[in-house]
From Swiss-Prot:
SUPFAM superfamilies: Actin-like ATPase domain, Heat shock protein 70kD (HSP70), C-terminal subdomain, Heat shock protein 70kD (HSP70), peptide-binding domain. InterPro entries: ATPase_NBD (IPR043129), Heat_shock_70_CS (IPR018181), HSP70_C_sf (IPR029048), HSP70_peptide-bd_sf (IPR029047), Hsp_70_fam (IPR013126). Transmembrane segments: none annotated. GO terms for molecular function: ATP binding; ATP hydrolysis activity; ATP-dependent protein folding chaperone; heat shock protein binding; protein folding chaperone. This is Heat shock 70 kDa protein. The keyword Nucleotide-binding applies. It holds the Pfam family HSP70. GO terms for biological process: chaperone cofactor-dependent protein refolding; protein refolding. Keywords: ATP-binding, Nucleotide-binding, Stress response. The keyword Ligase does not apply.
Length: 379
């Protein structure tokens, strides 16, 4: 501990001097320790650590979608920003811009915390009114929809508090009495590559054909980062809710950064997988749309019996034969099957296109305790 304290003292000395001395009496078995170190040697030993301090700066600019030239002031935060080499690296990174040293680096974090506290308390003080301090979601939040797709409701870096609501058709199978809501965080296209936060079931749903727009899901993050997910059966008003605190099941800073890096490196293949599953879901949805339309009273006299039989045969073939044996088909193959179905008996003219089956089972958006997730019944 004495050696660590002496090294810390030398580091601070080198921020204002070009050389520092370390003296420790009886460091080990009665042997005194004495040495000196220059600022140049110190900077050489710590060069990799100093360079790594620019990584969060670059990340903050990327996340905010800002260029270095758009930054007005560069404020130093934290005692280590007193190190001359760190200041030089930062100044060079911003093309020689002068650093703002008007705030004590040790007190800068406290200033920010005080402003955040005032904002959360609704302080009307003039000093706070002109300040904008935003917190953001570290990863995208969403749920699993048909085909294991990650359907995002709250995007990464969305400012919080925030609330998003989306309607889902494709969560239900034919006459299914309940639906499982699985909540994930992550940037990958498929939920298997993301982090499961929790799951809950919305049960006792009245029997209904597959695809009827029934389930409304709301993601709500408050100022403390607590996530509430509510699923509501729109036909009955019955709802179920799950609440996740910011420290239960959530990823660490290092894991978040790893997931962001992985998402960037797998972006192309993730998009291809998302498109493939979307095409598969669109085909399945169109089949059920056509089968349902064939039984509508208003269309019975418009479709010749021969054409009706062809369509019914195709509707039986696609989900029970072709899809069963082609689970890993490419996007183009699913689209080809859908075009064939549309062409038989001019389905697109007689029945009209399916308006809800092309988005992996989702429409466009409309608008805890220490033991873990809490599931709450809401009548």
């Amino acid at each position: 501990r004495r050696l660590r304290t002496a090294c810390e003292r030398a580091k601070r000395t080198l921020s204002s001097s070009t050389q520092a001395t370390l003296e420790i009496d009886s460091l080990f078995e009665g042997v005194d320790f004495y040495t000196s170190i220059t600022r140049a040697r110190f900077e050489e030993l710590c060069s990799d650590l100093f360079r790594s301090t620019l990584e969060p700066v670059e990340k903050a600019l990327r996340d905010a979608k800002l260029d270095k030239a758009q930054i007005h002031d560069i404020v130093l935060v934290g005692g280590s920003t007193r190190i001359p080499k760190i200041q030089k690296l930062l100044q060079d990174f911003f093309n020689g811009r002068e650093l703002n040293k008007s705030i004590n680096p040790d007190e800068a974090v406290a200033y920010g915390a005080a402003v955040q506290a005032a904002v959360l308390m609704g302080d009307k003080c003039e000093k706070v009114q002109d300040l904008l301090l935003l917190d953001v979601a570290p990863l995208s939040l969403g749920l699993e929809t048909a085909g294991g797709v990650m359907t995002t409701l709250i995007q990464r870096n969305a400012t919080i508090p925030t609330k998003q609501t989306q309607n889902f058709h494709y969560l239900l199978q034919n006459n299914q009495p309940g639906v499982l809501i699985q909540v994930y965080e992550g940037e990958r296209a498929m939920t298997r590559d993301n982090n499961l936060l929790g799951r809950f079931e919305l049960s006792r749903i009245p029997p209904t054909p597959r695809g009827v727009p029934q389930i409304e899901v709301t993601f709500d993050i408050d100022a403390n980062g607590i996530l509430s997910v509510t699923a509501t059966d729109r036909s009955t008003g019955r709802a179920n809710k799950m609440t996740l605190t910011s420290d239960k099941g959530r990823l660490s800073k290092e894991e978040v950064e790893r997931m962001v890096r992985e998402a960037a490196s797998h972006k192309v293949e993730d998009e291809a997988q998302r498109d493939r599953v979307a095409a598969k879901n669109s085909l399945e949805a169109y089949v059920f749309h056509v089968k349902g339309s064939l039984h509508e009273e208003s269309l019975r006299d418009k479709i010749p019996e021969e054409d009706r039989c062809k369509v019914q045969d195709k509707c039986q073939e696609v989900p029970y034969l072709w899809l069963e044996h082609n689970q890993l088909a490419e996007k183009e193959e699913y689209e080809h099957q859908k075009r064939e179905l549309e062409q038989i008996a001019s389905i697109s003219q007689l029945l009209g296109p399916c308006t809800w089956g092309s988005s992996c089972g989702a429409q466009a958006p409309k608008g805890g305790p220490s033991t873990g997730p809490v599931i709450e019944e809401v009548d």
